[in-house]
């Protein structure tokens, strides 16, 4: 894919943090757009297109008011229309339960699909002990799912649990969000030994049923650990067992062998449906020396 045809979009405060961290890992392969009612989300450390949903400068915010955020987005959508229209793949990142992410994400997804883009939404689901945020998220999720080709739910509770084990900040995605996006973008944006492209992705996510995107990282000494990590991704409770479609990319360094590729891919697909359509890709790069990464989109769940 050509540079600029992949767009990473952060919506709301958490979404902007996630998108900034993710874009840092693949700046040469994707554009970055940040959308929020709080201007402090737009930090100078990231090269990003920004849409401020409080153009009056009154610092009104949109906390717990999704309809207000949607209204303000529609007022400013013309400012980002050309960016959406030139993107083949739009990756939306947000956390539901507040105003901006809950109100604006579905609108961005719909506008992107109307422009012909493939839309992947990654949405954070609130902690169970936040009943108001959970109620807002429950109402916001269906239109996001309807307007996305693939909608991935991320449990903030599981993300926070993993962050503690990694000594990282869940609000920054506990590193997992960045790894997930980097894996997907490099899978589609760089030439590999066995190439995957957007049509392969469309084929997989077009299957009936639910779909999800997962990533696992490890070393060439422990390919089984890569698969185990992928299966323990901090999503909502979801099993890939019996999946009907799978796009899988295995990445490694110059030391990655055909044995590594077979070990990782065969271990991952072993629990999928016997008739699962599997599309396999592989890529080697100097910066992955000694390491392996598995990126998989599974569908028909």
Spans of model-derived segments:
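Tubulin/FtsZ superfamily GTPase core signature
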Residues: 1-301
């Amino acid at each position: 894919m050509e540079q600029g045809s992949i767009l990473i979009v952060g919506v709301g405060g958490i979404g902007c943090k996630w998108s900034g961290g993710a874009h840092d890992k693949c700046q040469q392969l994707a554009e970055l757009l940040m959308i929020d009612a709080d201007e402090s989300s737009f930090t100078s450390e990231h090269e990003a297109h920004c849409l401020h949903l409080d153009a009056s400068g009154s610092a009104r915010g949109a906390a717990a008011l999704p309809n207000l955020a949607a209204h303000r987005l529609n007022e400013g959508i013309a400012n980002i229309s050309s960016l959406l229209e030139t993107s083949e793949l739009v990756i939306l990142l947000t956390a539901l339960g507040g105003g901006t992410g809950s109100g604006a994400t579905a609108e961005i997804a719909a506008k992107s699909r109307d422009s012909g883009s493939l839309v992947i939404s990654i949405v954070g689901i609130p902690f169970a002990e936040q009943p108001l945020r959970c109620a807002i998220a429950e109402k916001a999720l269906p239109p996001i799912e309807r307007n996305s080709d693939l909608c991935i739910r991320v449990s903030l509770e599981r993300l926070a649990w993993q962050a503690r084990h990694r000594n990282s900040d869940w609000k920054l995605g506990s590193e997992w969000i960045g790894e997930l996006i980097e894996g997907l973008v490099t899978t589609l944006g760089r030439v590999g030994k066995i190439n995957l492209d957007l049509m392969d992705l469309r084929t997989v996510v077009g299957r009936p049923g639910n779909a999800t995107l997962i990533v696992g990282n490890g070393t060439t000494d422990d390919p089984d650990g890569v698969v185990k990590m992928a299966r323990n991704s901090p999503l909502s409770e979801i099993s890939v067992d019996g999946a009907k479609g799978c796009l899988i990319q295995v990445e490694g360094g110059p030391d990655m062998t055909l044995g590594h590729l077979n070990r990782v891919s065969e271990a991952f697909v072993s629990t999928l449906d016997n008739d699962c359509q599997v599309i396999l890709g592989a890529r080697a790069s100097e910066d992955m020396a000694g390491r392996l990464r598995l990126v998989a989109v599974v569908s028909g769940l």
